[in-house]
Amino acid sequence: MPTFNQLVRKGRKTMEKNSQAPALQKGFNSLRKKTTDASAPQKRGVCTAVRTATPKKPNSALRKIARVRLSNGIEVTSYIPGEGHNLQEHSVVLIRGGRVKDLPGTRYHIVRGTLDTAGVAKRRQARSKYGAKRPKEAKK
């Protein structure tokens, strides 16, 4: 434990928190071919592989995931939310931060309803999270 004088001289340093979505913190200067520090809420990328993964214990399922090469050159694993999707290799997608608790290493979500990603069909609740359009009212 430091003495009072040591604290007066040096003070306490605040711990720096590491980002939960580090790939969104980097940009890319294509002229200089260097990464830059440029935070973004989302990033565009191209799917390099679309596959399924099994979750950690005690869960059991086939979670849909995609390996995405971002516009800053970083390749990440991202989760495809919702039921059914139209993604394949070379699809252009938008990713956001947000981990999937039972898939280790999956720290990003694909945004549904933007770029090449279609919204979830026949979705009636929480539509904005899945890029689903408002359904037409039924005729009476």
From Swiss-Prot:
Modified-residue entries (3-methylthioaspartic acid), positions: 102
Disulphide linkage map: none
Entry GO MF terms: rRNA binding; structural constituent of ribosome; tRNA binding
Residue segments, region Disordered: 1-44, 120-140
UniProt-listed InterPro entries: NA-bd_OB-fold (IPR012340), Ribosomal_uS12 (IPR006032), Ribosomal_uS12_bac (IPR005679)
Alphabetically ordered keywords of this record: Methylation, Ribonucleoprotein, Ribosomal protein, RNA-binding, rRNA-binding, tRNA-binding
Bias kind Basic residues: ranges: 121-140
Pfam families: Ribosom_S12_S23
Record's subunit section: Part of the 30S ribosomal subunit. Contacts proteins S8 and S17. May interact with IF1 in the 30S initiation complex.
PANTHER family attached to this UniProt entry: 30S RIBOSOMAL PROTEIN S12 FAMILY MEMBER (PTHR11652)
Function according to Swiss-Prot or TrEMBL: With S4 and S5 plays an important role in translational accuracy.
UniProt-recorded name of the protein: Small ribosomal subunit protein uS12
Organism encoding this protein: Lachnoclostridium phytofermentans (strain ATCC 700394 / DSM 18823 / ISDg) (Clostridium phytofermentans)
